[in-house]
Amino acid sequence: MSLQSIKYQRGSLEILDQLLLPVVSKYLTVRGVEDGWKVINKMQVRGAPAIAIVGCLSLAVEIYPEEFGSKKSLRQEIEGKLNYLVSARPTAVNMKISADELITLANELTKDDNVTVEDMKQRFLNATEAMLEKDIADNRAIGANGAKAILEHVAESASAAAAGPVRVLTHCNTGSLATAGYGTALGVVRHLSELGKLEHVYCTETRPYNQGARLTAYELVHEKLPATLVLDSMVAALLRVKNVAAVVVGADRVAANGDTANKIGTYQIAVVAKHHGVPFYVAAPLTSVDLQIPSGDHIIIEVRPDREMTHVGEHRIAAPGINCWNPAFDVTPASLVTGIITEHGVFKPSALKAEITKLLDL
């Protein structure tokens, strides 16, 4: 059974504090937008889909008990608070897209004379709650589409073990802890396991925040999936000797041309995968694709505090006085990406914009 990182019922929101994992499993109460901003910014909740859901639900629990004198005041509250939540971690595009959708809804309801202020509030709450259920359904579709793509690639290869279970590598955390449930890249791993086609999954430690060691390994052990943790610096050796069938990672933002911003270290894994002829897949919902950004050069990369590199907990591990560069993400060029796995199918980066434009009827 997948872990539950987000517990929600109308008027109440709790999140699993991911900074304490894997040693302590503790839920934090999110009482409103300020709490939501803090848990996102401090990375007590992380993963682009989960950030968007927790951000939007934090506003939902804040406005649930409130009474508004007019639709205009409610609209202003929604717009101002959602834009504030976007600033908590700007690289993850899902929060911005979700905010824009909800602001558009609020504007439309404000203009509709047949909608009362209470109706408007209820419809806003319904819309935020629908995001939670949709994310889980989308993740399951991503898992199925990704597993199918990997197995088809293996079947077409010259491998003697083409028909057997596969070995895959993943990076960072893209499972139930990064989404509303099931996961994106880790959802692909889960679906392979459900099909009886997963021989082994390797996960990187993912320095400096160790999301792979702390979170992905925690999920894999919890679900008793066959897994091995490797250091970030071991990936080249791993792909050379362990017959890995595919690499599958998540994404915080995908540009229109297929360039992908994901957890720092993703780019070098893609380079190594290309060298060894291992297909490299990005698993992400359409909400992670930003068609307004032509390429990865336009993606804002969040830079985290030096302390995350120089300390483990309260213990310093780097020489005092050393300079640090700590970007949270890097951008993998589309030329290194085999396919982008979405809830609607697997697309080549070169066809991504056209396919999504057609899907969304833009």
From Swiss-Prot:
InterPro entries assigned: IF-2B-related (IPR000649), IF-M1Pi (IPR005251), IF_2B-like_C (IPR042529), Initiation_fac_2B_a/b/d (IPR011559), M1Pi_N (IPR027363), NagB/RpiA_transferase-like (IPR037171)
EC number(s) from the headed UniProt entry: 5.3.1.23
GO cellular component: cytoplasm; nucleus
Subcellular location(s) per record: Cytoplasm; Nucleus
Key word Isomerase present: yes
Taxonomy, superkingdom: Eukaryota
Record's keyword terms, sorted: Amino-acid biosynthesis, Cytoplasm, Isomerase, Methionine biosynthesis, Nucleus
GO MF term (any one): S-methyl-5-thioribose-1-phosphate isomerase activity
Main location: cytoplasm
GO biological process, one term: L-methionine salvage from methylthioadenosine
Sites marked Transition state stabilizer: C172
Pathway terms, separated by semicolons: Amino-acid biosynthesis; L-methionine biosynthesis via salvage pathway; L-methionine from S-methyl-5-thio-alpha-D-ribose 1-phosphate: step 1/6
Active-site residue list: D252
Gene3D superfamilies on file: translation initiation factor eif-2b, domain 1, Translation initiation factor eif-2b, domain 2
Membership in a protein family: Belongs to the eIF-2B alpha/beta/delta subunits family. MtnA subfamily.
Family matches, as HAMAP family: Salvage_MtnA
Alphabetical list of PANTHER family matching this protein: METHYLTHIORIBOSE-1-PHOSPHATE ISOMERASE
Job of this protein: Catalyzes the interconversion of methylthioribose-1-phosphate (MTR-1-P) into methylthioribulose-1-phosphate (MTRu-1-P).
NCBIfam families: eIF-2B_rel, PRK05720.1, salvage_mtnA
Protein name as it appears in the record: Methylthioribose-1-phosphate isomerase
